[in-house]
Amino acid sequence: MTLQPTAADVGAMYDQYTSLLTDVMAGFIHVGYWEDPSSEETMEVATERMTREVGARLSSSAGQHILDVGCGTGKSAVQIANTHGVQITGITVSKSQIEEAQALYGSAVQAGQVSYQFANAMDLPFADASFDGAYAIESLVHMDDRRTALQNIARVLRPGSRLAIADLCLDAHCPNPEALARFHELFQVPPMSSGEELQELLRETGFRVLEFTDIRDNVRPVCKFLEKKALSLEGEVGEKLLEIATSMATLKELGYAFITAERI
């Protein structure tokens, strides 16, 4: 049976596993980017680099307002806000992530650099053309209606602004559907789009695709960190985390890409 997790399902999953994921990923809720996949760089260095790469693709100017679609516990928003001098509104479907983000980065919230709120990208509560850019790190993959999500993001972006995406995608043909189905179940992911499908969807929802770069080899080192953490845990949580790590390591058709698009 094809899995179609709702936003509530995804939120519940992150409510349960956020603490574990931030522990593995140095405070972030996304994988790292290793320029040299054979290096011994730490997770902290790699996850900060991933955020830096996404932030740079926005080509933003100081004072602009940026939307973080799937902000996790808020660390990426603070890093990008500090680096580029922008104001960031982060949204997530996990109530526990909102609480943690506000607790961790209260000073940045008070300073007006960042704000965090509970919201669904498929029904954004913002006015048309109210943002100067947006980014989505490993959030689109969870959405059961990516077209509606991208239409909503396009609606709230000003013409000429950028959307920077870092996310999983799938090769057009996957010879191991059973392993893929298990990955979907563990990670609350509906059927994944291929890179080509994502680019076409962006074009159909009001964007011009500027870049598509497959970086699957540069993110795969995350698997060894996930495996190490999984082996330190007992019970179902450790077993599930080990399955996720194994799936990511062995499913060669599982890609990961930087996608940069411009609102037309």
Curated annotation (Swiss-Prot):
The keyword Transmembrane does not apply. CDD domains: AdoMet_MTases. It comes from the Eukaryota. Keywords: Methyltransferase, S-adenosyl-L-methionine, Transferase. It is an enzyme of class 2 (transferase). GO terms for molecular function: S-adenosylmethionine-dependent methyltransferase activity. Pathway: Antifungal biosynthesis. Disulfide bonds: none annotated. SMART domains: PKS_MT (SM00828). Pfam families: Methyltransf_11 (PF08241). InterPro entries: Erg6_SMT_methyltransf, MeTfrase_dom, Methyltransf_11, SAM-dependent_MTases_sf. One of its GO terms (biological process) is methylation. S-adenosyl-L-methionine binds at Q97, H142. Its EC number is 2.1.1.-. SUPFAM superfamilies: S-adenosyl-L-methionine-dependent methyltransferases. It catalyses: desmethylrestrictinol + S-adenosyl-L-methionine = restrictinol + S-adenosyl-L-homocysteine + H(+). O-methyltransferase; part of the gene cluster that mediates the biosynthesis of the tetrahydropyranyl antifungal agent restricticin that acts as an inhibitor of CYP51 and blocks the ergosterol biosynthesis. Within the pathway, resE uses S-adenosylmethionine to methylate position C4 of desmethylrestrictinol to produce restrictinol. The highly reducing polyketide synthase resH, the short chain dehydrogenase resG, the cyclase resF, the FAD-dependent monooxygenase resA and the enoylreductase resD are required to generate the first stable intermediate desmethylrestrictinol. Belongs to the methyltransferase superfamily. This is O-methyltransferase resE.
